[in-house]
């Protein structure tokens, strides 16, 4: 099975400016992500960025890069520009690998692509079990609930499903029904072309979760438990410091 990995890498991060170029163990962060994607067995790995300095860094590392417009509102829009510029066929499987996940396990990049290939869903993603009440009630940890066939019913920043009897007594413990969504996606190129033409939905604007647009328009999202749990992504300086420490200890 063939798939292409595209890594959106926006330069102007609000909390960590120049994030794709942040040095981790002697390499820019985006290069670490690119190397993980290459290890996944992707037939092609493309970094999609809005900044010439990122282009220079990726090319210096021997990678493939596409300089996109700077006005995209999401990584999916940036990915869609790459799909159009390369002219990928509608049935080509694309994996959207977040540019701020330098420790992403290569096996889950391949896993989400294989899951999509075996499904009729327009999109596939992954999740991991939540084991603490702190994480279940953390709005930055996105929860997902699925149906019997493994398709997403809903994504939320709230604690879903709500354990009525348990939580009526205490919120200190949780059951084994909670899943945290991982922000890695696989789609067919034709699906992305349709997605970017849909108007944003009310639910995604309330929750600030872009994937809810897919459910709003009646499309399916396949969800599976990830074969490996990703380490911390990089949103803040504290995250970057943690990742640097992990890489130094490897």
Swiss-Prot record:
Superkingdom of origin organism: Bacteria
Primary site of residence: cytoplasm
InterPro entries: Cytidylyl_trans (IPR003329), KdsB (IPR004528), Nucleotide-diphossugar_trans (IPR029044)
Subcellular location: Cytoplasm
Similarity comment text for this entry: Belongs to the KdsB family.
Function comment: Activates KDO (a required 8-carbon sugar) for incorporation into bacterial lipopolysaccharide in Gram-negative bacteria.
Name used for this protein in its record: 3-deoxy-manno-octulosonate cytidylyltransferase
């Amino acid at each position: 099975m063939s798939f292409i990995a595209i890594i959106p890498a926006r330069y102007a991060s609000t909390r960590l400016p120049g994030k794709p170029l942040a040095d981790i163990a002697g390499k820019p962060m985006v290069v670490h992500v690119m190397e993980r994607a290459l290890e996944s067995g992707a037939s092609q790995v493309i970094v999609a960025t809005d900044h010439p300095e990122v282009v220079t860094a990726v090319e210096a590392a021997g990678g493939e890069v596409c300089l996109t417009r700077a006005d995209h509102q999401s990584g999916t829009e940036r990915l869609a520009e790459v799909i159009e510029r390369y002219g990928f066929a509608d049935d080509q499987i694309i994996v959207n690998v977040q540019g701020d996940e330098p420790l992403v396990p290569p096996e889950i990049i391949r896993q989400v692509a294989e899951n999509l290939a075996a499904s009729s869903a327009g999109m596939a993603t992954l999740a991991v079990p939540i084991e603490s009440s702190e994480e279940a009630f953390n709005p930055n940890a996105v929860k997902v609930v699925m149906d019997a066939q493994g398709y997403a019913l809903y994504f939320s920043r709230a604690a879903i499903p709500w354990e009525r009897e348990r939580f009526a007594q205490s919120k200190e413990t949780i059951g084994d029904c909670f899943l945290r969504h991982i922000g890695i996606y696989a789609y067919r190129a034709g699906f992305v072309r349709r997605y970017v033409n849909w108007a944003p939905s009310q639910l995604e604007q309330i929750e600030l979760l872009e994937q809810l647009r897919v459910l709003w328009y009646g499309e399916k999202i396949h969800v599976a438990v990830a074969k490996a749990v990703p380490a911390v992504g990089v949103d803040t300086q504290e995250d970057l410091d943690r990742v640097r420490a992990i890489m130094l200890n490897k």
